[in-house]
């Protein structure tokens, strides 16, 4: 037999496709096309949520209290809401034009979008341009927090006389940092009182010595008057100065680089939707309100607890799924659903360490509810007692308010505690006071025994002391009562007679 020849063919190596980095537009399309949802699991799965949108970004880095909950087919991802709800729960990062006032601009947008309510993140003077956050309908609940957020400006100051180079101007800007006294300008909508405003950082960008113009950048507290700052700059330099031009670069979380749009963009987007039913441009112009809350610490609640919070219930620990690191007491946080919707703004009552070690208690108190009521179904009042109460109301054993009637069984009256009643907690208080009364009775018995033992040893001493005390108390009571007995009356009459005698003697003299 001839030796068999083995022929080997070279293996074809599959070429790995080079993954191109996603552009911003592609990411937006993916976020809109795909489904983003936290699924209930018994084990914690490893997720890559760095590309998840808005409040669900880096969701896997949150601390897990429990991963088990019952998902409800209610609510939706903020980016996938219906266009009507999307606009009513959104905001616009508007590039305010020069000349119209902030209120005029907001009124125009309300008319263009045909909504009932709009608000803005802080008034800009008519000549000032730049970032103006316009909140629509439900998003107006975040207006106050946006108005108090920090702001950044780029301005031009005109000096009345020339100075030697721009170093003096930059030094003067550095001195005008920190807490400063400011009085509003002559033409202002508020009372011209002295107020303290903080300037966090400022730097000079450019100075033109020929035209005596300086461009500067300022990061400051809300309510700072840049016009007043320019006047102070001129006073520091000794030449005088005034503000020539101003633009707001950042308001809160949003800056001029974060999808800023003009009034024409809003008008065109609404026209396209009205005439061609193309909502893609409206979704580019309007952004969900959750984008304003991305800098806050997050608490994730179960779906069954969402509607209770919308009705004002306390944020309790059993309804918590996940929580973020670094939560401090009295810090402003945002409470979200598993789909990334903002439920409310809250004030934390527990730190992250306390949340991780406790199994009950109030985590936070509500500051402002954002979500509409009954977006999720009611899940309270489904316990055994509540269900029994509903059945008894249907059967006529209780009235329509759940109060006992003549037909109510005696066992129900004895066992059931009505916490909503005005005379509530009677049984509870008795149950709480019972051990206290028992303890007091034991203490009284012990005291009696101690006193009896003391009386057996020295019976005469305590009796003498008691008698002395009684004797001492009698004259005190008489004096305090203001002369109830006859002796007191005699003393007063004697004093009156003496006074009369003295008066008669003086008259005779």
Curated annotation (Swiss-Prot):
The keyword Transcription regulation does not apply. It comes from the Eukaryota. One of its GO terms (cellular component) is box H/ACA telomerase RNP complex. There is a cross-link at residue 413 (Glycyl lysine isopeptide (Lys-Gly) (interchain with G-Cter in SUMO1)). GO terms for molecular function: box H/ACA snoRNA binding; pseudouridine synthase activity; telomerase activity; telomerase RNA binding. It is found in: Nucleus, Nucleolus; Nucleus, Cajal body. Ubiquitously expressed, with elevated levels in Purkinje cells, the olfactory bulb, and Leydig cells of the testis. Keywords: Acetylation, Isomerase, Isopeptide bond, Nucleus, Phosphoprotein, Ribonucleoprotein, Ribosome biogenesis, RNA-binding, rRNA processing, Ubl conjugation. Transmembrane segments: none annotated. Residues 446-509 are annotated as: Nuclear and nucleolar localization. One of its GO terms (biological process) is rRNA pseudouridine synthesis. This is H/ACA ribonucleoprotein complex subunit DKC1. Residues 297-372 form the PUA domain. Pfam families: DKCLD, PUA, TruB_C_2, TruB_N. NCBIfam families: CBF5, PRK04270.1, unchar_dom_2. Its EC number is 5.4.99.-. Residues 1-24, 447-509 are annotated as: Disordered. It catalyses: uridine in 5S rRNA = pseudouridine in 5S rRNA. The lineage of its organism: Eukaryota, Metazoa, Chordata, Craniata, Vertebrata. There is a cross-link at residues 20, 39, 43, 191, 394, 413, 424 (Glycyl lysine isopeptide (Lys-Gly) (interchain with G-Cter in SUMO2)). Residues 10-19, 466-476 have a biased composition (Basic residues). Belongs to the pseudouridine synthase TruB family.
